[in-house]
Swiss-Prot record:
Classification via Gene3D superfamilies: 3.100.10.10
Disulphide connectivity of cysteines: none
Organism per entry: Methanopyrus kandleri (strain AV19 / DSM 6324 / JCM 9639 / NBRC 100938)
GO cellular component, one term: cytosolic large ribosomal subunit
Name of the protein in its database record: Large ribosomal subunit protein eL18
Protein keywords: Ribonucleoprotein, Ribosomal protein
Pfam families, A to Z: Ribosomal_L18
Protein family (similarity comment): Belongs to the eukaryotic ribosomal protein eL18 family.
Biological process, per Gene Ontology: translation
GO molecular function: RNA binding; structural constituent of ribosome
Originating gene: rpl18e
Length: 127
């Protein structure tokens, strides 16, 4: 019987999780530890959020204008988005990226958001 590592096998994802945990301690930002734990889940349990859901949350006022939406998983392109949102995620589908940018929004990787905002302020986690 051979030993297999637990957790994600994607090397880039493992590095990101390590960096998120380090930032959580260094900047006293519990949001990064929460995101690291969510990204450590098996792939089938990770978040998959459609752009239509993000648009609905923005229209209802759940997502404020100054906040960055963080999806600890993949953003999918089902639905219509009319609000210009700033979205960070591990992955984006091609159509999701096109729809967000067409609505005047911005797509970021979680690593880009971490480097830009290490304190973790004004972040809304959506699953």
């Amino acid at each position: 019987m051979t030993w297999a590592p637990t957790g994600p096998t994607n090397v880039e994802l493992r590095k990101l999780i390590r960096d998120l945990k380090k930032a959580a301690c260094e900047y006293n930002a519990p949001v990064w530890r929460d995101v690291a734990e969510r990204l450590s889940r098996p792939r089938r349990q990770r978040a998959e959020v459609n752009v239509g859901k993000l648009d609905g949350l923005a229209r209802r006022g759940v997502i404020q204008e100054e906040e960055t939406v963080l999806v600890p998983g993949k953003v999918l392109g089902d639905g219509v988005i009319t609000q210009p949102l700033r979205v960070a995620a591990w992955r984006f589908s091609r159509t999701a990226r096109m729809k967000i940018e067409a609505a005047g929004g911005e797509c970021l990787t979680i690593r880009e958001l971490l480097e830009e905002n290490p304190e973790g302020s004004y972040i809304r986690i959506i699953e």
